[in-house]
Each structure stands twice: as C-alpha cells, then as structure tokens.
C-alpha cells in the first residue's frame, strides 16, 4: 500500500492504514465499560448490552473479541474486568468524548451534543483531540 502522506485513500483505506486494531464498535464497548465501572463495582454482559442498546449475544461476541485482543478478561457468565491496556484505552475514549462534547456544546451553544460526538469521535486522532481541548479552553476563557 502507498505510504505517501499526501496519497488519497477511500474511507476504508484510511481505516486499513490505521495502526490500531480497534474498530469503532470496540472503542464504544471499552468506553461504556469504563462508564459502568464508575457507577458500580463490576460489569456484566447484560448491563453492557442494555447500556449500548444491543442484544446480549452481540455484546458477548464483542467482549470475547476484546478479550482475545487483551483489552479485558472475561469468562462466560462472569464479570468483565479491564486489563491495564483496556483501562488506558477506555479512559482515553472518555477523555476524547468529553473534549468533543465540550467543544461542540460551546460551538453550538447547547448543553449536550451526544449524537454528533458519537458520530465523529472515532475519526479524529489524539493530536486533533488534544488541540481541540486547548482550543475549547481558550474559547471558554474568552467568554
């Protein structure tokens, strides 16, 4: 594949060029597990499925895949435990979500931009997120 930074790709091509093995769905699951862990001591498949509005069988498949990729530990009918890698990524996804929501709320003069954040959060790299955090802070200070 062409490694020229000025080369154009299809959307799928950019995804294939990504260094991370995480899909947007995997990111959503890790983010939700962190959110649930903030409220309760442990997470089970049914709670995860309910909060992501998916079937328990779909959640079970994704949790199994995340376990195989070493992001979490899970035994069938047991609790979900994040590995250190899973915890680091999950916490970053929470940060990314908050940065985007804060920026879009400031931009649109609103209190919540959940739908827009969910649609775009998977497509911005860490540098862009960090710069949006700085920009949002500066814009907030101007008010």
Language model segments and positions:
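C-terminal regulatory/oligomerization modules of transcriptional regulators
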Residues: 1-2, 115-143
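Short helix-coil-helix linker/hinge
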Residues: 20-30, 83, 94
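Pre-recognition alpha-helix immediately N-terminal to the DNA-recognition helix
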Residues: 27-34, 88, 99
């Amino acid at each position: 594949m062409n490694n020229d930074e000025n080369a154009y790709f299809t959307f799928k091509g950019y995804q294939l060029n990504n260094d991370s093995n995480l899909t947007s769905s995997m990111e959503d699951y890790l983010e939700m597990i962190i959110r649930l862990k903030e409220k309760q001591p442990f997470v089970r498949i049914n709670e995860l499925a309910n909060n992501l509005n998916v079937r328990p069988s779909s959640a079970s498949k994704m949790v199994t895949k995340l376990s195989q990729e070493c992001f979490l530990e899970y035994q069938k009918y047991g609790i979900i435990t994040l590995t250190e890698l899973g915890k680091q990524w999950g916490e970053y996804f929470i940060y990314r979500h908050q940065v985007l929501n804060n920026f879009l709320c400031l931009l649109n003069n609103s209190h919540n931009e959940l739908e827009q954040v969910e649609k775009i959060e998977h497509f911005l790299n860490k540098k862009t997120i960090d710069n949006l955090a700085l920009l949002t802070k500066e814009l907030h200070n101007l008010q």
